Amino acid sequence: MEQTVPVRGRKKSWTGKVVSDKMDKACVIAVERRVQHPVYKKYFKKTTRLMVHDENNEAGVGDLVRVVECRPLSKRKSCRLAEIVEKAK
């Protein structure tokens, strides 16, 4: 008999800018998204701040980074740094 293994989906990923790197092995990124107002239909920006696990303290303030979700690492951290897309100037 052949057993079938359920296929899991891909993990979510976000791209954002580092706004704080003052913690050890962690940083905070801001992810912007465009949302449409339900009544007036105008688009506006909303910002979400994510706390990210940065094992080697690679990211600095102003860097553009890509993060992926992972298991909860602490009360507020459930993402880890995947790559630094662009370093700050």
Swiss-Prot record:
Classification via CDD domains: Ribosomal_uS17 (cd00364)
PROSITE patterns found in the cross-reference section: RIBOSOMAL_S17
Swiss-Prot/TrEMBL keywords: Ribonucleoprotein, Ribosomal protein, RNA-binding, rRNA-binding
Coiled coil, from the record: none
GO molecular function, one term: structural constituent of ribosome
Xref: Pfam families: Ribosomal_S17 (PF00366)
GO CC terms, sorted: cytosolic small ribosomal subunit
Any Gene Ontology biological process: translation
InterPro entries: NA-bd_OB-fold, Ribosomal_uS17, Ribosomal_uS17_bact/chlr, Ribosomal_uS17_CS
Description of how the protein assembles with itself and partners: Part of the 30S ribosomal subunit.
Family: Belongs to the universal ribosomal protein uS17 family.
NCBIfam families: PRK05610.1 (NF004123), uS17_bact (TIGR03635)
Summary of the function given for this chain in its UniProt record: One of the primary rRNA binding proteins, it binds specifically to the 5'-end of 16S ribosomal RNA.
Protein name, entry field: Small ribosomal subunit protein uS17
Organism from which the protein derives: Chlorobium chlorochromatii (strain CaD3)
Source organism phylogeny: Bacteria, Pseudomonadati, Chlorobiota, Chlorobiia, Chlorobiales
GN (gene name): rpsQ
